[in-house]
Structure formats: structure tokens, C-alpha cells
From Swiss-Prot:
InterPro entries: Dyskerin-like, PsdUridine_synth_cat_dom_sf, PsdUridine_synth_N, PUA, PUA-like_sf, PUA_sf, tRNA_PsdUridine_synth_B_fam, TruB_arch. The active site is at D66 (nucleophile). It holds the Pfam family DKCLD. One of its GO terms (molecular function) is RNA binding. GO terms for biological process: box H/ACA sno(s)RNA 3'-end processing; mRNA pseudouridine synthesis; rRNA pseudouridine synthesis; snRNA pseudouridine synthesis; tRNA pseudouridine synthesis. It is an enzyme of class 5 (isomerase). This is Probable tRNA pseudouridine synthase B. Belongs to the pseudouridine synthase TruB family. Type 2 subfamily. CDD domains: PseudoU_synth_hDyskerin (cd02572), PUA_Cbf5 (cd21148).
Length: 333
């Protein structure tokens, strides 16, 4: 990540905090944990178990896995649930065991796998909790890892919302043998990887260690601040004076920007951060990095989702009449 300074600015440490230095109670309500989901429970059940074991009001999972599917299941804790839709932006990766119902030549198998790379059409399965309309999904990568008789082990990197069971069914039909998905494991879910996933029992043990012995070290290793789950987004760093206005949903203006990440375009989602590294909001850039650096006034990011609660930073802006299109007033930082 390369940040370009638009205007040097200092932050006041009387407000906000470094995300990695939050007290443990705040972390549990503004954090996340990546669970290694076991075979059996639903994703909703796993999220509910995490909520109950950590004594939270709410928790939500990012990306449903069928009961028999294992692997990386990110769980948003407390107020972090508002970040879940952002986790669906990057691709997901799976390792799948596919079983053919008849013999097939290696050359035919390889050709079918090539055919199913790129844009594909899918209709959600009957059990899906969404409307069964035809949709386009992108298969970025698909690689055969091993073939043993009629069993094919493969890895695929695909767009969020791709049904792997349906992908296997469709490939089996195209091959002329028919096929079914025997096993599936998610290895990457957006910005989260299976090697950082933790077992439910380990999370419970760490929580008990903190509650009974006051030892929060192990719990901090497992629970990450919400900002950890937004690291895949390009960043715009704002001055303290702009934070609370953005927390109220106001469009980000050029005068509130301190630093901009190189390479931002208008076709992506960007993260608005404080000078301390706290996530404030996400939004749609109205111009690219180069133009943001040049402009002295005007709107630069349209806010689409506010993350930080209002009131953490001081309010040093004035409400405008809804019909007033002029730039909001704020003090220089």
C-alpha cells in the first residue's frame, strides 16, 4: 500500500484509538473471528454459538456454508455485523472433491474444466434461500489437483455467490457422466484464509481464560479488530475534523482528506480511515487518486455505508439545509 499525502495533518489522541490497542471489551463488540467451521452445524448455528460463548448481543457470519461444508467462516462480533456485506466483494476459494458417476477420459475432463473457467450461467439449486433466476458468476481459476478413478479433487477461485454444488452438477452433465459433490472446504473467504481460522473450542478456552484468570493474551490472538477484515480495500485517510460528519453519512469533501492510496479508480469501493487507522465508512470514489490530489474543493467520495458510531470524534461541522448544495462548514485541522 502506497499512501500519497494531500495535506499533512495531526490527530488528537483524546478521541478514538488505535484499532489494535482497544480494550478487550470494546474489541469483542467491534471485532471478528474466523472460525474453522466443522461439518454438521449450519453457518447460522456456528455464529449463534460464538455469540453465546462470548456473551454478545449479536454476531453474524459472512458467507453461508452448507451444514456438511467445512472451512473458513468469518464471524462478525457485535457492531461489526455492518461490515459483513463488504466481505463479499473479494473472490472466495474452495477445494472440492467431485465424484463422477461413470468413467471419463482425462482429456475430456481437462477440456470440461477449461470450459467452466470464466463467466458461467447458474440457476440456484432448489434448496437455495434466494430466487431461482438465472445469474452470471465468474470462475477466476479452476485447477485439477488429483484424479483417483472417478474422484476428482480440484481447487477453484470464484465470485461470491457461486454455488459449487451446482457447478459440479453442471460439469458432470457437460462431461456426459453426471457427477455430485462429495466434499467441500472453503480455504479463502474474501480477505480471510483457512490458516487463520480457529476451532470453536479454542475460542471458548481463550474466553474462559480471560474471564476466570484475567488473561486476555490468547483471546486477542483469535479476535481481530474489524479493520482487519477491510484490509482488501484501498484507503483514504481523513482529518479528525472530517470524521464525525462522515459518521453522520455526509459526503466526503476534498478539504477533509489527508492521505490517499495510490491507484484508486471510480469503479471500486474505498475505505475511509482516521489518522489512527480506524474504519469510519466505505464509499464510492467520485474521482481517481490523481484528481483527488489536484482538487482543492468539492465532493470526492459518496458514502455508502457508515461503520464508526457518531460522537467518537468531536462534531466541528454545521448541519446544512437540505436544499443547500454548498460545501459544509468545518474547522481546519
Amino acid at each position: 500500500m502506497e499512501l500519497i499525502v494531500k495535506e499533512e495533518s495531526k490527530t488528537d489522541y483524546n478521541y478514538g484509538s488505535d484499532p489494535y490497542k482497544r480494550d478487550i471489551k470494546t474489541l469483542l463488540n467491534t471485532g471478528l473471528v474466523v472460525i474453522d467451521k466443522p461439518s454438521g452445524p449450519t453457518s447460522h448455528e456456528v455464529a449463534a454459538w460464538v455469540r453465546n460463548m462470548l456473551n454478545l448481543v449479536k454476531a453474524g457470519h459472512g458467507g453461508t456454508l452448507d451444514p456438511k461444508v467445512t472451512g473458513a467462516l468469518p464471524v462478525a462480533l457485535g457492531n461489526t455485523t455492518k461490515c459483513v456485506p463488504i466481505w463479499h466483494i473479494p473472490p472466495k476459494e474452495y477445494v472440492c472433491l467431485m465424484h463422477l458417476h461413470d468413467d471419463a477420459k482425462l482429456e475430456d475432463i481437462e477440456n470440461i474444466f477449461k470450459e467452466f473457467t470464466g463467466r458461467i450461467h447458474q440457476r440456484p439449486p432448489l434448496k437455495a434461500a434466494v430466487k431461482r433466476s438465472l445469474r452470471i458468476r465468474k470462475i477466476y481459476e479452476i485447477e485439477i489437483l488429483e484424479i483417483d478413478g472417478r474422484d476428482i479433487l480440484f481447487r477453484t477461485k470464484c465470485q461470491s455467490g457461486t454455488y459449487l454444488r451446482k457447478l459440479v452438477d453442471d460439469m458432470g452433465e457437460a462431461l456426459g457422466t453426471s457427477a455430485h459433490m462429495q466434499e467441500l472446504r472453503r480455504t479463502i473467504s474474501g480477505p480471510f484464509y483457512e490458516n487463520e481460522a480457529v476451532y470453536l473450542q479454542d475460542l471458548l478456552d481463550a474466553y474462559i481464560s480471560w474471564k476466570e484468570d484475567g488473561n486476555e493474551e490468547e483471546l486477542r490472538k483469535l479476535v481481530k479488530p474489524l479493520e482487519y477484515g477491510l484490509q482488501h480495500l484501498k484507503k483514504i485517510i481523513v482529518k479528525d475534523s472530517a470524521v464525525d460528519a462522515v459518521c453522520h453519512g455526509a459526503t466526503l469533501y476534498s478539504s477533509g482528506v489527508s492521505k490517499i492510496e495510490k491507484g484508486i479508480g471510480t469503479d471500486e469501493v474505498v475505505l475511509i480511515e482516521t489518522l489512527k487507522g480506524e474504519a469510519v465508512a466505505v464509499g464510492k470514489p467520485l474521482m481517481n487518486t490523481k484528481d483527488m490530489l489536484k482538487t482543492e474543493e468539492g465532493e470526492v467520495v459518496e458514502i455508502t455505508r457508515v461503520i464508526m458510531e457518531p460522537g467518537i470524534y468531536p462534531r466541528i461541522w454545521k448541519k446544512r439545509n437540505k436544499n443547500d448544495k454548498s460545501k459544509p462548514e468545518s474547522k481546519k485541522n
